[in-house]
């Protein structure tokens, strides 16, 4: 089996700790976020959410990027983007759709994709796979 290289799409309060945990366990980890400001903060070992300490960021070996093409180096992709709900309690899946579209552009045979974001049953089959 090839070496596992993990990408985390979405570096918020869920994605960043997940990326750090994989990195601590010696997995090559790529952290991706569409927010360039967020990526620049993380490159300086700063987490404004307070979820991960500066010390833990300094010890981690994560490649932070805002270029989705960098995800092509990974073979195990985890999507951790927000899924806010509107005033009618309907989830906004636009960030899931965007993440799936970007990963779909670089996906290789035998790659694995996991949606860690909060979604209702059927989202993978109905929304993610067709993209």
Q: How would you label these PLM feature ranges?
A:
Residues 11-12:
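Glycine-rich Rossmann-fold phosphate-binding loop(s) that bind the pyrophosphate
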Residues 15-16:
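N-terminal Rossmann-fold NAD(P) dinucleotide-binding loop
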Residues 7-8:
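Hydrophobic Val/Ile/Leu positions in short beta-strands of Rossmann-like dinucleotide-binding domains
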Residues 1-2, 108:
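Short helix-loop-beta connector
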Residues 85-131:
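Rossmann-like NAD(P)(H) cofactor-binding subdomain of soluble oxidoreductases
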Residues 2-4, 24, 28-30, 34-76, ...:
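Conserved N-terminal Rossmann-fold NAD(P) cofactor-binding segment
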């Amino acid at each position: 089996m090839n070496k596992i290289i993990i990408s985390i799409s979405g570096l918020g309060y869920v994605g960043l700790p997940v990326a750090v945990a994989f990195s601590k366990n010696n997995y090559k980890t790529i952290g991706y976020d569409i927010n360039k400001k967020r990526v620049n903060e993380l490159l300086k070992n700063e987490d404004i959410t307070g979820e991960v300490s500066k010390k833990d960021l300094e010890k981690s070996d994560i490649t932070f990027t805002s270029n989705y093409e960098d995800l092509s180096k990974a073979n195990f992709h985890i999507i951790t983007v927000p899924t806010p709900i509107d005033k009618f309690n309907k989830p906004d899946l636009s960030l899931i759709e965007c993440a799936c579209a970007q990963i779909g552009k670089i996906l290789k045979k035998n790659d694995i994709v996991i949606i860690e974001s909060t979604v209702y049953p059927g989202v993978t089959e109905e929304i993610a796979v067709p993209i």
